[in-house]
Amino acid sequence: DAFFAVYIARRDKNDGSGFYTELKKNYIKLQASLKHNPVMKNEASEASDAILLNLEKVNAATIINYCHLVVSLLSKTNPTESDKANALHALSEAIGFLHGYRLLNPGFSRITTEQIDRNLERMNAPVQGQAACYRFVTQPETELVKLQQVISELKSIYGFSDQQIEDFRKNWITEQGR
């Protein structure tokens, strides 16, 4: 899908080792193995699993990007109304991407329903109950740490390196003028 392709490109440094390259490699592997079915059935399964995991990782990287943005905007000494609005927009995007995992059948994703729900709670957007996302604006000194916890948990779940977590701060399309 074209919309998700943009998110993939935003998280990819275009250095031949990112999400796009991994997805391309595994789509080619999947296509080749399906042409030689059933001889390459295991390869098709491996490629399919790798594609799904990579797409899941892109989603997690996008959540991390939005969490970084919220922390950056609301950590300012005097955030403007525009900063606050942009932070709440970014938070809403992160919540939406995280909530999207709940649409997957349990067992088909690396992240568990419990982990999703715990992180939605941290974002003040519980599955059951009243959302209180405004607290990130009204009480940033106590609330922003929760977004760092979300980042840390996603890092652990998906095995992201410290460098990747830093890289997820950036929109690589903008950075590289692509």
Segments the model singles out, each with a brief description of its role:
Residues 1-178:
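Mature extracytoplasmic or organellar-lumen-exposed domains after removal of signal/transit peptides
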